[in-house]
Structures are given as C-alpha cells and as structure tokens.
From Swiss-Prot:
The active site is at 199 (proton acceptor). HAMAP family: NAD_Glyc3P_dehydrog. One of its GO terms (molecular function) is glycerol-3-phosphate dehydrogenase [NAD(P)+] activity. The keyword Lipid biosynthesis applies. Its EC number is 1.1.1.94. This is Glycerol-3-phosphate dehydrogenase [NAD(P)+]. SUPFAM superfamilies: 6-phosphogluconate dehydrogenase C-terminal domain-like (SSF48179), NAD(P)-binding Rossmann-fold domains (SSF51735). It is found in: Cytoplasm. Belongs to the NAD-dependent glycerol-3-phosphate dehydrogenase family. GO terms for biological process: carbohydrate metabolic process; glycerol-3-phosphate biosynthetic process; glycerol-3-phosphate catabolic process; glycerophospholipid metabolic process; phospholipid biosynthetic process. It comes from the Bacteria. PANTHER family: GLYCEROL-3-PHOSPHATE DEHYDROGENASE, GLYCEROL-3-PHOSPHATE DEHYDROGENASE [NAD(+)] 2, CHLOROPLASTIC. Pathway: Membrane lipid metabolism; glycerophospholipid metabolism.
Length: 340
C-alpha cells in the first residue's frame, strides 16, 4: 500500500512516521509546498520547524510536486490531508481536479469552516460537487486524543477513523494500526468531527480556568458541562451523542484541556494572564484551531437553537467582547437548572 501525506506540519510529519514504520521503503510520501523545508528534513533527518527532536524514518519519500504526490496513488492506496482546516477546501479541490481514478481520502484537521460553519466532510462534499469528474471517492476523518510529538516518537496512542465506507476504514487500519497505535472505526462522521471541533474551544475555557487559579473543581465543571454542550450539538446536527463518550469526544477533550502540549489550553492560560490574542498567536507559532472555529461553532449552535453557554462565552472572550474574568462571572451567575 502507498500512503501519501499532504502537509508537512507537526501532525502530517508524525503520521507519516507512523505509516513508515509499517509500510515498505518508498511507500510513504510526505508532500510539502516548501522545498526548503524538505531539504532541511533531508539534511537533518527531522522536521525541525514543526517536530523538533524526532528522527524520521529514512524510508519516507519527500515530495514537492503536488501532481506526482496524487497520481502515484491507485484505488487501493491512501491519501492523507494533513493541512489545517483553513487549507482543506483548497487542497481537496486540487486533489479532485487531478484524480483520474477513485481515491481513499482521509483528513486530520479539526474544526469548522469560518463563515459557513461547515464540518470538514461537508467542505469536501461541496468541493466534490464542483470538481469531481464522475469518480466516486471514499473519504473520512482520522481523529482522537493525540499530540503529534508523542505520535512521532512512537508512544502509545488510540485514534478513530470515521467513514461510511467500511473498506476505507480497513485501509486506514492497515496503514496505521500497529506497534503502539490502535485505530478504531466509526460510521459517525458528524459526531467525530464535531467532537474534534468543540473540544478545542472547551480546552481554551479550561486553560482560562487554570490560568485564573480557579481550582480543580472548576476544571471538572468546565469539562463535564462542556461535554454536555458537545453532545447536544452533535445530536442537533444529526450525529450520535454517544460518539462524544469515545476517543474523539471525551478522550480528546481530556487531553487537549489538561495536557501541557495543548496549544488551545496554552491560549486560555495566556488570556487569563492578560495577554492579547494577537500577541498570544504570534508567540504560539502554530495553529490553535479552537481560536479559529469558536465563532463558527457558536454560529452553528445559534442556528440550531442549541444552548452552549461555555462555548458562547469563549467566543465572546476571543472576540474581545468579554474579559476572562467577566466570562467566569456570567457563567457562574446563570440561573439554576436541571442537569441534562
């Protein structure tokens, strides 16, 4: 099996390493639009810009030609889109224009499209309707609690591939399920993708609570009530609320809200310290998807009349309408309710 990964950021590089541990030499290709980045990887044996300290398998083929990266694949191979959510639309459009035969496609990004509040698979379906040449592709999402650095280092990890295609799930499992990585399968794309989007926003809230020294009780309340918000939204959109109790919901939420490697948690910590969002993002150096999708999640909840107070407050904090301290006061001042 050949595996092509589009995007040589931290997660793309990590998942390429995982695939290379299983596949034969030359079967795993890592594409980057930046030739200087690939030269640096070839020279040093690691992606110093995004995954420093992790030596990459020498069998990974480094690719700068987008067309070659796509056209090397057959209908039995796997294409992995490892761009951020902001790059998904453009990347999948390019893929569909070049595809000459059915492809197996998964994406790793988590979030919603700004302005439209579309889930990743809905973005893919939109682009498929515009650029498809009558070819039926199989597609899905790979998600779950995973820091790229730990995956790159080969540490234990469990993820979920979500797709309506059983064969795609089996291909993804064949590519990545080995050694210290387990891959579970699901047919609930909505639940898996929304869990990955909402948990990033909730991780910012947890970071704010920790940064304000509100205590472990407060953190537990944020995670528990945040999970309830996630489940309500998943059900309203048409997914399975029970999916939120798995790896891509509560599992990813726990990791992102409490792990020190979490960029979204770090945003919350620094907001609580009084730093401005532009300053935080400039120092971060990498994408924090919770910042980008908070407004989109809030818009989707309003459209569907789903109550998500923690998520809504995070949207107000990130847009500068509320300070972290005022957001806490508003949340704690809400009327008593039955727990649902």
């Amino acid at each position: 099996m050949k595996v092509t990964i589009l995007g040589a950021g931290a997660w793309g590089t990590a998942i390429a390493s995982q695939a290379a541990r299983q596949q034969s030499a030359g079967d795993v290709s890592l594409w980057s639009r930046d030739p200087s980045q690939l030269l640096e990887i070839e020279k040093t044996g690691e992606n110093q810009a995004y995954l420093p300290g992790i030596k990459l398998p020498k069998s990974i083929k480094l690719e700068n030609d987008f067309s070659n990266a796509i056209q090397r694949l057959s209908s039995n191979d796997l294409l992995v889109i490892a761009t951020p959510m902001s790059g998904l639309s453009q990347t999948i459009a390019q893929v569909l224009k070049l595809a000459k035969q059915p492809l197996n496609i998964i994406w790793l990004c988590k979030g919603l499209e700004p302005n439209t509040s579309l889930l990743p698979h809905q973005v893919v379906e939109r682009e498929n309707s515009l650029h498809n040449h009558g070819i039926k592709h199989a597609y899905g999402a790979l998600s779950g609690p995973s820091f790229a650095h730990e995956v790159g280092a080969g540490m234990p990890c469990a993820l979920t591939v979500a797709s309506t295609s059983t064969s795609l799930c089996e291909i993804v499992q064949a590519a990545f399920h080995h050694g210290n990585m387990r891959i579970y399968s699901s047919d609930d794309l909505i639940g898996v993708e929304l869990g990955g989007a909402v948990k990033n926003v909730l991780a910012i809230a947890a970071g704010i609570g920790d940064g304000l020294n509100l205590g472990l009780n407060a953190r537990a309340a944020v995670l528990t009530r945040g999970l309830a918000e996630m489940m309500r939204l998943v059900k309203a959109v048409g997914g399975k609320s029970e999916t939120c109790m798995g790896l891509t919901g509560v599992g990813d939420l726990i990791l992102t809200a409490t792990g020190d490697l979490s960029r979204n948690r770090r945003v919350g910590l620094e907001l609580a310290a009084g730093k401005s969002l532009p300053e935080i993002l400039a120092n971060l150096g990498h994408v924090a998807e919770g910042v980008l999708c908070a407004a989109a999640v809030g818009d989707l909840a309003k459209r569907l009349d789903v109550e998500m107070p923690i998520t809504a407050m995070m949207g107000d904090v990130l847009s500068g309408q509320l300070t972290p301290q005022d957001a806490v006061k508003k949340l704690m001042g809400r009327d008593p309710k039955i727990e649902t």
